[in-house]
Amino acid sequence: MDSFYIITNILKDKDYAVTDKICNYIEQKGKKWTLAKKDEEGHILPGTVPSDVECGLVLGGDGTLIRAIRDLEGEELPLLGINLGTLGYLAEVELKDYQYAIDRLCGEEHAAIELRMMLEGVAGDEKRDLAVNDIVLTREGNIRIVQFNVYVNGTLLNTYLADGVIIS
């Protein structure tokens, strides 16, 4: 891979010290990088991923990776999470191992790209959400118990009477 898209959680890398270190390492390998353009809420601006980018490096925790996946929905861009958080279940690469990971991505022996299953949650006719890890359905307002009809691929899986349901 020759070109990387860098997505940084600025709450985890406030002064961009880690981002700079990773970008400098990419340059040392003779490769290119582009820093993600974000709006004031921290979402990646649609249509700003350069066409020559081959991989996104997400610097943050699992939440940062999930947000990047949602923001980049529809892009054919593999993402690799570099964990700057406390728990890196989805952000698989620990910061101390970033050079090894980049070496693998840039080398002759490319790292394998895994396709991950994603869930799409639809509530009623209007609310739609993309999930990488789980979907949480909860009640609104003062309603005590709600009936949840859970469908999978259009087939009723089960009906639950509950305060909420977590689908993972």
Model-derived features with residue positions:
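Catalytic core of DAGKc-family lipid kinases
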Residues: 87-164
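Proline-centered loop/turn at the N-terminus of a beta-strand
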Residues: 76-78
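ATP/NTP phosphate-donor binding region
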Residues: 1-55, 95-112, 123-129
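Short glycine/serine/threonine-rich phosphate/pyrophosphate-binding segments
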Residues: 64-68
